[in-house]
Amino acid sequence: MRRLTLILAIFASFTAAFAQKHITDSLMINGQMRTYTMFLPEGIQKDAPLVVFMHGYSKKKVKNFDRFGLDPVAAREKFAVCYIHGLPDSTNHYGYYVGYPPQASMQKHETSDICKITEAVQERYQLSKVNTFATGMSNGGDLCYLMAYEGQTTFRALAPVAGITLNWIFQKYEAPHPISIYEIHGTADKTSSWYGDMENKGGWGAYLPLKISIGYWVARNRCTNIEPTDTIPSKDPASTHYIVQHRFTGGTDGTEVWVDEVVGAPHTWHAKDMNTAEAIWAFFRRHLK
């Protein structure tokens, strides 16, 4: 009997580990093979929430998503994570089309493609078509803004990290509907400057200062409340960084705009200064329906 119990325990352990293993799959979208990696936690239910993640602009294919810390949160909260892999541009950097100069040769319907991938994932894994959210780092964060301006309806809320609004997007589009946005950004970011780069000194294309970028969404969402700012220290006792939390609430249909201003921090996911994945899920959880 003890032997049978041991065998069953080992089997259960194996099953749990397998259930939480990353699953990589592909599908054809607009003539291009798009690859994604799923994390489906053990015990996930039908119609569970889905968080879609887009990585940063990279010299090589991004394979290690563990450093973003979303999986442990998903395992506890029982939501799925879909990591969508970027495509190469003319310089063989992997990412998502947002209009960087090296991306001129890429197909220019990234919002539509990301939404189609997400909808296929919802169907394939029986996930919620309502409680679906998107987050991204750097290039992936920039894509969050492009998707918001283009009026996607697949995602209920967006959480760009180190994201920027390129000026061509700002000039071309008028966002057709409000959407909740949570930006996390370092003030010492030299890649995606907090202060913008309207002269295109960085080579990404001209982009807005973050205060203007965020101000657009505060106005578009018709937020009526500015909550008192809260300042919290970095979780790293040795760090001189600190986080100023800005909250604009009371928007149309409950929309809001959050900004975590990580003072002194560079271009990063900010996991050394705060529990970024936890913070993003806390924001998304507010918008579950």
Q: Where are the predicted features?
A:
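Bacterial Sec-dependent N-terminal signal peptides
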Residues: 1-21
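Cap/lid segment of the alpha/beta-hydrolase catalytic domain
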Residues: 85-109
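A domain-start/cap signature at the N-terminus of enzymes
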Residues: 17-50, 62-68, 76-80, 106-109, ...
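Accessory cap/linker subdomain of secreted extracellular hydrolases
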Residues: 187-230
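Flexible "cap/lid" loop of the alpha/beta hydrolase fold
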Residues: 164-181
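Alpha/beta-hydrolase active-site loop
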Residues: 103-124
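Short beta-strand/loop motif that positions the catalytic acidic residue
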Residues: 183-185
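Short substrate-entry loop that stabilizes the transition state in hydrolases
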Residues: 44-92, 155, 167-168, 191-193, ...
